[in-house]
Amino acid sequence: MTSLSKEAVLVHAALEERGLETPLRGEVLDRETRKRRIKEHMTEIMQLLNLDLSDDSLAETPHRIAKMYVDEIFSGLDYANFPKITVIENKMKVDEMVTVRDITLTSTCEHHFVTIDGKATVAYIPKDAVIGLSKINRIVQFFSQRPQVQERLTQQILVALQTLLGTNNVAVSIDAVHYCVKARGIRDATSATTTTSLGGLFKSSQNTRQEFLRAVRHHQG
Protein backbone atom coordinates (compact mmCIF):
# COMPACT_ATOMS: atom_id res chain seq x y z
CA MET A 1 0.00 0.00 0.00
CA THR A 2 1.33 3.44 -0.95
CA SER A 3 2.23 5.56 2.07
CA LEU A 4 0.60 8.97 2.22
CA SER A 5 2.39 12.27 2.66
CA LYS A 6 2.04 14.13 5.95
CA GLU A 7 0.11 16.86 4.14
CA ALA A 8 -2.35 14.36 2.62
CA VAL A 9 -3.01 12.80 6.04
CA LEU A 10 -3.59 16.22 7.65
CA VAL A 11 -5.97 17.40 4.93
CA HIS A 12 -7.96 14.15 4.91
CA ALA A 13 -8.31 14.28 8.72
CA ALA A 14 -9.43 17.93 8.64
CA LEU A 15 -12.12 17.16 6.06
CA GLU A 16 -13.30 14.09 7.98
CA GLU A 17 -13.54 16.13 11.19
CA ARG A 18 -15.75 18.73 9.48
CA GLY A 19 -17.92 16.20 7.62
CA LEU A 20 -16.65 17.51 4.28
CA GLU A 21 -14.85 14.44 2.95
CA THR A 22 -16.23 12.79 -0.18
CA PRO A 23 -18.35 9.76 0.85
CA LEU A 24 -15.97 6.80 0.60
CA ARG A 25 -16.19 3.11 1.47
CA GLY A 26 -13.58 1.67 3.80
CA GLU A 27 -12.39 -0.97 1.33
CA VAL A 28 -9.58 0.16 -0.97
CA LEU A 29 -8.71 -2.03 -3.94
CA ASP A 30 -5.41 -1.69 -5.74
CA ARG A 31 -5.33 0.33 -8.93
CA GLU A 32 -5.14 -2.55 -11.40
CA THR A 33 -7.97 -4.45 -9.71
CA ARG A 34 -10.16 -1.36 -9.91
CA LYS A 35 -9.41 -0.96 -13.60
CA ARG A 36 -10.14 -4.60 -14.34
CA ARG A 37 -13.46 -4.59 -12.53
CA ILE A 38 -14.60 -1.28 -14.00
CA LYS A 39 -13.75 -2.62 -17.46
CA GLU A 40 -15.87 -5.72 -16.81
CA HIS A 41 -18.85 -3.70 -15.61
CA MET A 42 -18.54 -1.15 -18.42
CA THR A 43 -18.53 -3.99 -20.95
CA GLU A 44 -21.80 -5.21 -19.47
CA ILE A 45 -23.32 -1.71 -19.50
CA MET A 46 -22.43 -1.20 -23.15
CA GLN A 47 -23.86 -4.59 -24.07
CA LEU A 48 -27.08 -3.71 -22.24
CA LEU A 49 -27.21 -0.59 -24.42
CA ASN A 50 -27.11 -2.99 -27.40
CA LEU A 51 -23.71 -1.78 -28.58
CA ASP A 52 -21.58 -4.18 -30.59
CA LEU A 53 -18.20 -4.39 -28.87
CA SER A 54 -16.74 -6.41 -31.72
CA ASP A 55 -16.69 -3.17 -33.73
CA ASP A 56 -13.16 -1.77 -33.78
CA SER A 57 -14.42 1.67 -32.72
CA LEU A 58 -15.99 0.27 -29.54
CA ALA A 59 -13.80 -2.71 -28.68
CA GLU A 60 -11.37 -0.80 -26.44
CA THR A 61 -13.92 1.61 -24.93
CA PRO A 62 -14.41 -0.31 -21.63
CA HIS A 63 -10.62 -0.39 -21.15
CA ARG A 64 -10.30 3.32 -21.98
CA ILE A 65 -13.06 4.28 -19.55
CA ALA A 66 -11.57 2.18 -16.74
CA LYS A 67 -8.15 3.77 -17.25
CA MET A 68 -9.67 7.26 -17.46
CA TYR A 69 -11.66 6.79 -14.26
CA VAL A 70 -8.81 5.44 -12.13
CA ASP A 71 -5.81 7.35 -13.54
CA GLU A 72 -7.42 10.62 -14.57
CA ILE A 73 -10.86 12.02 -13.82
CA PHE A 74 -11.30 10.23 -10.46
CA SER A 75 -7.65 10.15 -9.42
CA GLY A 76 -8.42 12.61 -6.61
CA LEU A 77 -10.22 9.84 -4.70
CA ASP A 78 -6.78 8.41 -3.88
CA TYR A 79 -4.76 10.50 -1.41
CA ALA A 80 -1.62 8.83 -2.74
CA ASN A 81 -2.11 11.30 -5.62
CA PHE A 82 -2.26 14.36 -3.34
CA PRO A 83 0.14 16.95 -4.77
CA LYS A 84 3.55 17.46 -3.25
CA ILE A 85 3.19 20.68 -1.30
CA THR A 86 5.88 23.26 -0.65
CA VAL A 87 5.03 25.53 2.27
CA ILE A 88 7.62 28.24 2.91
CA GLU A 89 8.23 30.27 6.06
CA ASN A 90 6.82 33.77 5.64
CA LYS A 91 10.17 35.49 6.19
CA MET A 92 9.10 38.60 4.27
CA LYS A 93 6.13 39.02 6.65
CA VAL A 94 3.68 39.26 3.77
CA ASP A 95 0.32 40.24 5.27
CA GLU A 96 -1.64 41.33 2.20
CA MET A 97 -4.05 39.24 0.20
CA VAL A 98 -2.59 36.77 -2.33
CA THR A 99 -5.09 35.94 -5.08
CA VAL A 100 -4.94 33.37 -7.88
CA ARG A 101 -7.63 33.85 -10.53
CA ASP A 102 -8.83 31.85 -13.53
CA ILE A 103 -7.80 28.42 -12.23
CA THR A 104 -9.29 26.04 -14.77
CA LEU A 105 -11.08 23.04 -13.34
CA THR A 106 -12.94 20.10 -14.81
CA SER A 107 -14.84 17.85 -12.45
CA THR A 108 -17.67 15.31 -12.60
CA CYS A 109 -21.17 15.67 -11.17
CA GLU A 110 -21.65 12.85 -8.68
CA HIS A 111 -25.39 12.66 -9.42
CA HIS A 112 -25.18 11.91 -13.16
CA PHE A 113 -21.43 11.40 -13.82
CA VAL A 114 -21.27 14.16 -16.42
CA THR A 115 -18.88 17.10 -16.64
CA ILE A 116 -18.63 20.18 -14.45
CA ASP A 117 -16.50 22.78 -16.24
CA GLY A 118 -15.42 25.99 -14.57
CA LYS A 119 -12.86 28.32 -13.05
CA ALA A 120 -11.84 29.03 -9.48
CA THR A 121 -10.56 32.11 -7.70
CA VAL A 122 -8.56 31.42 -4.54
CA ALA A 123 -7.15 33.95 -2.07
CA TYR A 124 -5.40 33.85 1.27
CA ILE A 125 -3.75 36.24 3.70
CA PRO A 126 -0.42 34.74 4.85
CA LYS A 127 0.31 34.19 8.51
CA ASP A 128 3.43 32.16 9.31
CA ALA A 129 3.69 30.44 5.91
CA VAL A 130 3.24 30.99 2.20
CA ILE A 131 2.65 28.37 -0.45
CA GLY A 132 4.08 27.97 -3.95
CA LEU A 133 1.44 29.48 -6.23
CA SER A 134 1.25 26.49 -8.57
CA LYS A 135 0.40 24.33 -5.54
CA ILE A 136 -2.90 26.18 -5.20
CA ASN A 137 -3.78 25.14 -8.76
CA ARG A 138 -2.76 21.57 -8.01
CA ILE A 139 -4.94 21.41 -4.90
CA VAL A 140 -7.91 22.69 -6.92
CA GLN A 141 -7.23 20.05 -9.56
CA PHE A 142 -6.86 17.25 -6.98
CA PHE A 143 -10.26 17.84 -5.43
CA SER A 144 -11.82 18.39 -8.86
CA GLN A 145 -10.73 14.90 -9.92
CA ARG A 146 -13.58 13.24 -8.02
CA PRO A 147 -17.31 12.79 -8.36
CA GLN A 148 -18.37 16.10 -6.82
CA VAL A 149 -21.01 18.58 -5.87
CA GLN A 150 -19.76 22.13 -6.36
CA GLU A 151 -20.58 23.25 -2.82
CA ARG A 152 -18.44 20.50 -1.29
CA LEU A 153 -15.62 21.05 -3.78
CA THR A 154 -15.45 24.73 -2.81
CA GLN A 155 -15.27 23.90 0.90
CA GLN A 156 -12.73 21.09 0.44
CA ILE A 157 -10.32 23.48 -1.28
CA LEU A 158 -10.84 26.04 1.50
CA VAL A 159 -10.21 23.58 4.35
CA ALA A 160 -7.19 22.03 2.60
CA LEU A 161 -5.51 25.42 2.27
CA GLN A 162 -6.44 26.49 5.80
CA THR A 163 -4.90 23.27 7.10
CA LEU A 164 -1.69 23.55 5.09
CA LEU A 165 -1.16 27.28 5.67
CA GLY A 166 -2.10 27.34 9.36
CA THR A 167 -4.56 30.19 8.93
CA ASN A 168 -8.32 30.57 8.58
CA ASN A 169 -7.84 33.54 6.24
CA VAL A 170 -8.69 31.73 3.01
CA ALA A 171 -11.42 32.34 0.42
CA VAL A 172 -12.54 30.25 -2.55
CA SER A 173 -15.05 30.96 -5.30
CA ILE A 174 -15.98 28.66 -8.18
CA ASP A 175 -18.02 29.56 -11.26
CA ALA A 176 -18.96 26.50 -13.31
CA VAL A 177 -21.22 25.07 -15.99
CA HIS A 178 -22.91 21.79 -15.08
CA TYR A 179 -23.53 19.45 -17.99
CA CYS A 180 -26.23 17.66 -15.98
CA VAL A 181 -28.13 20.94 -16.54
CA LYS A 182 -26.73 21.77 -19.99
CA ALA A 183 -26.88 18.37 -21.71
CA ARG A 184 -29.85 16.67 -20.04
CA GLY A 185 -32.98 17.47 -18.05
CA ILE A 186 -33.83 21.14 -18.57
CA ARG A 187 -31.00 21.51 -21.14
CA ASP A 188 -30.16 25.08 -20.23
CA ALA A 189 -27.02 25.85 -22.21
CA THR A 190 -26.29 29.29 -20.74
CA SER A 191 -26.67 29.08 -16.95
CA ALA A 192 -23.71 28.84 -14.58
CA THR A 193 -23.41 28.19 -10.85
CA THR A 194 -21.26 30.23 -8.45
CA THR A 195 -20.28 28.98 -4.99
CA THR A 196 -18.17 30.82 -2.44
CA SER A 197 -16.58 29.71 0.83
CA LEU A 198 -15.02 32.27 3.16
CA GLY A 199 -12.87 31.86 6.27
CA GLY A 200 -11.31 34.12 8.88
CA LEU A 201 -11.02 37.78 7.84
CA PHE A 202 -12.75 37.06 4.55
CA LYS A 203 -15.88 36.33 6.58
CA SER A 204 -15.49 38.77 9.49
CA SER A 205 -14.08 41.85 7.69
CA GLN A 206 -16.34 43.56 5.18
CA ASN A 207 -13.39 45.31 3.49
CA THR A 208 -11.44 42.06 3.05
CA ARG A 209 -14.52 40.26 1.78
CA GLN A 210 -15.28 43.01 -0.73
CA GLU A 211 -11.69 43.02 -2.00
CA PHE A 212 -11.96 39.28 -2.68
CA LEU A 213 -15.39 39.57 -4.31
CA ARG A 214 -14.07 42.31 -6.60
CA ALA A 215 -11.39 39.87 -7.77
CA VAL A 216 -14.10 37.27 -8.39
CA ARG A 217 -16.22 39.72 -10.38
CA HIS A 218 -13.14 40.70 -12.40
CA HIS A 219 -12.68 37.02 -13.31
CA GLN A 220 -16.35 36.58 -14.23
CA GLY A 221 -16.28 39.72 -16.33
From Swiss-Prot:
PROSITE patterns: GTP_CYCLOHYDROL_1_1 (PS00859), GTP_CYCLOHYDROL_1_2 (PS00860). Its EC number is 3.5.4.16. It comes from the Bacteria. GO terms for cellular component: cytoplasm. It holds the Pfam family GTP_cyclohydroI. One of its GO terms (molecular function) is GTP cyclohydrolase I activity. Pathway: Cofactor biosynthesis; 7,8-dihydroneopterin triphosphate biosynthesis; 7,8-dihydroneopterin triphosphate from GTP: step 1/1. Zn(2+) binds at C109, H112, C180. Keywords: GTP-binding, Hydrolase, Metal-binding, Nucleotide-binding, One-carbon metabolism, Zinc. SUPFAM superfamilies: Tetrahydrobiopterin biosynthesis enzymes-like. One of its GO terms (biological process) is tetrahydrobiopterin biosynthetic process. It catalyses: GTP + H2O = 7,8-dihydroneopterin 3'-triphosphate + formate + H(+). Belongs to the GTP cyclohydrolase I family. Toroid-shaped homodecamer, composed of two pentamers of five dimers. This is GTP cyclohydrolase 1. It comes from Serratia proteamaculans (strain 568). The gene is folE.
